[in-house]
Amino acid sequence: MDEIGKNDMENSCSFCGRSQEEVDKLIAGPDVFICNECIELCNEIVQEDIVGSKDDGQEVLPGLVPKDVKAHLDDYVIGQAYAKKVLAVAVHNHYKRIDAPVELLDDSVELQKSNIILLGPTGSGKTLVAQTLAKILNVPFSVADATTLTEAGYVGDDVENILVSLLQAADYDVEKAQRGIIYIDEIDKIARKSDSASLTRDVSGEGVQQALLKIIEGTVASVPPKGGRKHPQQELVKIDTTNILFICGGAFVGLGRVVKRRAGKKSIGFSADLSADKRSESELLEAVRPEDLLKFGLIPELVGRLPVIASLRELSEDDLVRILREPKNALTRQFEKLFQFEGVKLTFTEGSLAAVAKKAIARKSGARGLRSVLEEAMLDIMYDIPSLSNVQECIVNEQVITDGEYPVLLYGEEEKSLT
């Protein structure tokens, strides 16, 4: 566009009608003119629309403070109080950063993302915590398995493919996907074998960590909407990952030994503090520092992009019993609802719940193993109950879980046997 000279007196703004003499500048386009005052007005309107769009349902944390987030987590996740507090603060800061009013943004202060790394044994609730956070915040959520990822050019899933499932969870709404949460499970499995840089290509380890860096930090990635490898004829969708919250989780078996060695080096001699040797694996994970993750095999750049470290403790028998009974979607409540559909009241005794917890601990599967234990114990009665009539109550006691006995059935006036 050209600026109109002072001599072109016949020209006027196509929007407000002011002449060249009435404005400071008049910009010319093909058969159209716009003055500097209309340009300023347009800028103000655009700014109002940007702020307004955040007020029209885009804000993720309407009035939710960290205490509220933790309280919501308490409804679904038993125990892990410290981890829930860490996550509540990190999530609150993340979405406040995204939803900050335009007038409060200061170019001199750049608020960086606080991606999260979750440490904890299998079945301690890492995936559940991340999933529940997304549910509380009403944002799209997806889970990716780090062990299936490879560098570009190798057989396996491209790192960018982890964005595809998030896009699908957002019903292909790119704007919603760009504010979602991605949980990358088993991140510990792609640690390099030693903490020294490798001279050879490591398809499933360091190479994948390098590939994850840009996506986790923030980049515009082109992804095939239906997944799979990219090819020239395929339509690609651009996703900006700058505001996607990444939570990486893993059991990190052996990381406790790294922490113990670090603690031991600082206390050598007659006055050495032996407390580190007496701590459990869960207690050692609570003391993890970034340098321990480097020793374990995560590359420095990736550790730097995961500044928030939260550890989850191994669940005790009491924790598992509470998980069976207390959350809003507790397993016992789910089974009770299934029996309610058949018109039967289902009751679990305290002994039966303790027996389920003991079996899950023996299998070293934590909370994840509770459902399989219950499914096995309840198979016969769930097979029979639709064929029985006049059953009013089914009581599951300890022997049903430990010895495979049949539950106690209480009938009404008329009792009907299996045919």
Swiss-Prot record:
Q: Where is the ClpX-type ZB domain?
A: 1-54
Q: Which key words are in the record? A: ATP-binding, Chaperone, Metal-binding, Nucleotide-binding, Zinc
Under PROSITE patterns, the record lists:
CLPX_ZB (PS51902)
Q: Where ATP is bound, by residue?
A: 121-128
**Which biological process terms from the Gene Ontology are attached to this UniProt entry?**
cell division; proteolysis involved in protein catabolic process
Which annotated residues bind Zn(2+)? 13, 16, 35, 38
- One Pfam annotation reads zf-C4_ClpX
This protein's GO CC annotations: HslUV protease complex
Q: Check the record and name the Gene3D superfamilies matching this protein.
A: 1.10.8.60, ClpX chaperone, C4-type zinc finger domain (6.20.220.10), P-loop containing nucleotide triphosphate hydrolases (3.40.50.300)
Q: Which InterPro entries match?
A: AAA+_ATPase, ATP-dep_Clp_protease_ClpX, ATPase_AAA_core, Clp_ATPase_C, Clp_protease_ATP-bd_su_ClpX, ClpX_bact, P-loop_NTPase, Znf_CppX_C4
Kindly list the residue ranges recorded as spanning the membrane: none
Taxonomy, superkingdom: Bacteria
Q: Which residues form a coiled coil?
A: none
GO MF terms listed in the record are: ATP binding; ATP hydrolysis activity; ATP-dependent protein folding chaperone; protein dimerization activity; unfolded protein binding; zinc ion binding
Instruction: Note the SMART domains from the entry.
Output: AAA, ClpB_D2-small, zf-C4_ClpX
| Similarity section | Belongs to the ClpX chaperone family.
Q: How does it assemble?
A: Component of the ClpX-ClpP complex. Forms a hexameric ring that, in the presence of ATP, binds to fourteen ClpP subunits assembled into a disk-like structure with a central cavity, resembling the structure of eukaryotic proteasomes.
Show the HAMAP family listed in the entry: ClpX
Record's function text: ATP-dependent specificity component of the Clp protease. It directs the protease to specific substrates. Can perform chaperone functions in the absence of ClpP.
- NCBIfam families from the UniProt entry: clpX (TIGR00382), PRK05342.1 (NF003745)
Q: What is this protein called?
A: ATP-dependent Clp protease ATP-binding subunit ClpX
**Could you tell me which species this protein originates from?**
Desulfotalea psychrophila (strain LSv54 / DSM 12343)
The gene coding this protein: clpX
